[in-house]
């Protein structure tokens, strides 16, 4: 009976967190730094829940945390950055101020939400290096394949957040409700920079000969986030 009560308390806490988690995109836009503080506070909430949960509740916490991360990055974090200009040497940490290169855009987003990654090292490396670290068991490579084949792969693999490395570029992919969008700091349109666009539009994703795609937020990746596990 005591065990059941403990389990129900954990589940109730998860449900409460879930309700709070998905309110961000509907709330008035906050200062970016303040919003990131809320994200880190939420991460700490998940860690406290996870540490005190039994085995069955731990799985539920991972599921909820994954949904929170995907929703927060896709619907809250990205919009802060839309319109931040691109530059090959751009390293800004603040949306709408300065410029940002494609690699720095990807690694800055991940570090900002609380992943312990070597932001500068990864931003300056080939994207395949960190894609293999973030999604070691969820990677697919395409060489000189038609865009329709890649769209089919993404739709079959399912909704979620992906990172993609190209010939000379890197960015995120959002798959949701059969819609596929490429989010990146766009060197084709440097004055616009960070933007979201259909993968089948005129962009580096469509034009690239090589593509390596990793699906983010596996159980392992979510646990690394919750437990502050560092990547090298």
Task: Report the location of each language-model feature.
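Charged/polar, solvent-exposed surface patches and flexible loops
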Residues: 48, 67, 71, 75, ...
């Amino acid at each position: 009976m005591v065990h059941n009560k403990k389990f129900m308390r954990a589940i109730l806490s998860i449900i409460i967190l879930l309700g709070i988690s998905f309110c961000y995109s509907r709330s008035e836009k906050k200062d970016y730094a303040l919003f990131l503080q809320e994200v880190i506070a939420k991460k700490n909430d998940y860690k406290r829940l996870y540490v005190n949960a039994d085995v069955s509740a731990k799985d539920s916490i991972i599921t909820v945390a994954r949904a929170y991360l995907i929703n927060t990055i896709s619907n809250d974090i990205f919009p802060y950055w839309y319109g931040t200009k691109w530059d090959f040497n751009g390293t800004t940490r603040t949306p709408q101020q300065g410029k940002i290169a494609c690699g720095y855009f990807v690694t800055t987003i991940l570090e900002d939400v609380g992943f312990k990654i070597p932001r500068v090292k990864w931003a300056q490396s080939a994207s395949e290096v960190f894609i293999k670290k973030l999604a070691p068991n969820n990677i697919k490579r395409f060489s000189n394949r038609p865009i329709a084949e890649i769209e089919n792969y993404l739709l079959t693999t399912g909704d979620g957040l992906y990172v993609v490395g190209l010939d000379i570029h890197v960015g995120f992919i959002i798959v949701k409700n059969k819609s596929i969008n490429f989010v990146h700091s766009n060197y084709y349109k440097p004055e616009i920079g960070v933007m979201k666009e259909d993968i089948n539009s005129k962009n580096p994703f469509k034009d690239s000969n090589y593509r390596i795609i990793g699906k983010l937020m596996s159980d392992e990746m979510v646990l690394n986030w919750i437990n502050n596990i560092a990547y090298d």
